[in-house]
């Protein structure tokens, strides 16, 4: 599973609920690509955010792959004076880098020469490039460089979760690139027309699939049809509905709805019906006080690996039999309420996502 994540989205608390839950269950085969443009809504992120992101993901067992420099920058670093340029880039504050990006090549040149001084090799490296070439070099970050991205993806040879931190420029290639106000900024008609011309998109053909690309349409379509994402057909699966037979009817003395719910779930847990086999329960707080204890005692808690109930093994008196098992049908979430809603949504869509129907409770 691959997700593209904006760096501003890391402000959301449910991100960290998910990271902790993933660590609990030994999350595998998951990549998050963080679009690290360092701009959030109406401003630029705080200095040092990268370190916090890196350490947080590493704490939960993720591999961190940083895509900071594009191929143009990496080639420039190999030139005489390149190491001095790399050091300047690494030390440049995010706000200054964004402002210079918006101002363009002449501003880059003046700032670099002012701060680096006349150092021979690095001065020559800068002066060999036009303003346009210098701007292209300084904004050639790893997240915009397809060869760098492919090299990073192809370097992964395991199934552990990976966090790719891809440095980018917000609004890259547009007149608003780098400006702190670009989140709500709009290009004017003249700017849109210039962009359209630069991308070889003809008027009236804006919605054509391959408009502006150099390769013939039929060649591009053949390629896209053969890539694994499309070659396997639709990814929207389906599953048969679950028959409901002999649903438990609870009778007897007066009881609360919560107590009645618990008794219904216990009777289902005792049965071998198709309905009971497809139910997955969860609770964002205390499982026992929500009357799911009887269900869990019979259906166990889910975990990738079996874990015994040590209290039970040590003969500590308890009404609960808390055994973890890969076939368990209850997911323990602690008090992670946002995880609850994400789980309910994912389990409810399991027929479409995976071709197996689950009934989340």
Predicted feature descriptions by range:
Residues 17-23, 48-49, 179-182, 270, ...:
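Short, solvent-exposed amphipathic alpha-helical segments in soluble enzyme
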Residues 36-255:
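Long, well-ordered, tryptophan-enriched scaffold segments
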Residues 9-12, 38-42, 72-76, 170-174, ...:
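Flexible loop/turn segments at secondary-structure boundaries
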Residues 1-2, 125, 130-140, 147, ...:
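Thiamine diphosphate
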Residues 2-5, 13, 33-35, 65-67, ...:
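Generic beta-strand/beta-sheet core signal
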Residues 23-24, 58, 157, 352:
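Anion (oxyanion) recognition and catalysis
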Residues 26-30, 61, 356-358:
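Short glycine-/polar-rich loops that comprise or flank the Walker A/P-loop
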Residues 12-35:
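A short alpha/beta connector and helix-capping loop motif
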């Amino acid at each position: 599973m691959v997700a593209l994540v904006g760096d501003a989205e890391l402000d959301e608390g449910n991100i960290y609920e998910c990271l902790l839950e993933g660590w609990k269950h030994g999350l595998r085969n998951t990549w998050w690509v963080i679009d690290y443009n360092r701009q959030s809504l109406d401003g630029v992120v705080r200095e040092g955010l990268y370190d916090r992101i890196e350490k947080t993901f590493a704490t939960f067992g993720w591999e961190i792959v940083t895509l900071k420099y594009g191929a143009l920058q990496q080639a420039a670093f190999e030139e005489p004076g390149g190491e001095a340029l790399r050091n300047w880039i690494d030390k440049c504050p995010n706000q200054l880098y964004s402002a210079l990006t918006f101002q363009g090549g002449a501003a880059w040149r003046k700032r670099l020469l002012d701060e680096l001084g006349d150092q021979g090799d690095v001065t020559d490296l800068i002066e060999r490039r036009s303003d346009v070439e210098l701007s292209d070099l300084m904004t050639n970050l790893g997240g915009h460089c397809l060869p760098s991205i492919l090299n990073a993806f192809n370097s992964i040879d395991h199934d552990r979760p990976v966090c790719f931190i891809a440095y980018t420029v917000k609004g890259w290639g547009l007149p608003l690139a780098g400006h702190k106000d670009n989140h709500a900024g709009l290009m004017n008609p003249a700017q849109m027309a210039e962009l359209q011309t630069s991308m070889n998109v003809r008027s009236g053909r804006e919605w054509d699939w391959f408009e502006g690309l150099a390769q013939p349409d039929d060649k591009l379509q053949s390629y896209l049809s053969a890539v694994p994402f499309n070659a396997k057909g639709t990814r929207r699966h389906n599953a048969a509905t679950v028959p409901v037979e002999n649903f438990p009817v609870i009778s007897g003395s007066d009881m609360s709805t919560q107590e009645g719910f618990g008794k219904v779930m216990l009777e289902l847990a005792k049965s071998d019906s198709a309905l009971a086999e497809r139910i997955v329960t969860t609770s964002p707080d205390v499982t026992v006080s929500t009357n799911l204890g009887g269900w869990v005692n019979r259906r166990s808690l889910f975990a990738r690996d079996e874990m015994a109930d040590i209290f039970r093994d040590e003969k500590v008196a308890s009404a609960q039999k808390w055994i973890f098992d890969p076939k368990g049908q209850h997911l323990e979430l602690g008090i992670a309420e946002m995880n609850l809603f994400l789980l309910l949504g994912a389990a409810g869509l399991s027929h479409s996502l995976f071709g197996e129907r689950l009934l989340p409770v």
